[in-house]
Amino acid sequence: VDSAKRENVPVLAYDRLVRNSDVDFYISFDNVKVGELQARYLLDRAPKGNYVLIGGSPTDNNARMFREGQMNVLTPAISRGDVHVVADQWAKDWLPSEALRHTENALTQAQNNVVAIVASNDSTAGGAIQALEEQGLAGKVFVSGQDADLAGCQRVVAGTQSMTVYKPIAPLASRGAEIAVSLARHEPLQPNGKVNNGFKDVPAILLEPIVVDKNNIVQTVIADGFVRLQDVFRNVPPDQWPKVAPKESGTRP
């Protein structure tokens, strides 16, 4: 970034905020909102009880923003005494094995008395759910996720993962390209927000993330072709597959 600025080249931070730097613009999904959606989904379904928080990589700024959003929602319930956080951990490099280890420890500490696990993405959700399976608790504890990856979507329809958060790639890529061209041409931009990166308030366009659960998975990630119905429901008996129109099956022409 410093080298580009010395040459008067504008810099766009694309989907990852560059900390403590003089970037000109930032585009991503509203990552604080992602965390809020995760926590709100779980809190609506488990308003009281013991919670486990599994964050992502502690060196990833996005992970910090997800946690900020999660705490925006959970803090009032914690203050009321409705929610008790029995473990608050970070998964190095977003590794499922880290989430597995942290969740195993949390379940031991809480004697399996856990109602919800706020996992910050689908890979950490997968590790947490593995720990739940070992205790016969999979599907009995609410678990969040994010990224709508195939394994996460499979767990959603299987009922072991409660939800995921979908961030459509197409609008991010197209808007990012438009912004890059406008920056190169020194054309004015219309941000819809700003994010402080430790050096400055960076003007930003923050796109809306989408909550996905078993009730809308066909109409969202499958309809968009992000994942295919036959892949998502691979582990579900065919007679239990949803009846959908061809355009909703996720099969591209």
Q: What is each PLM-predicted segment?
A:
Residues 1-253:
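A residue-level marker of the well-folded mature domains of exported/periplasmic proteins
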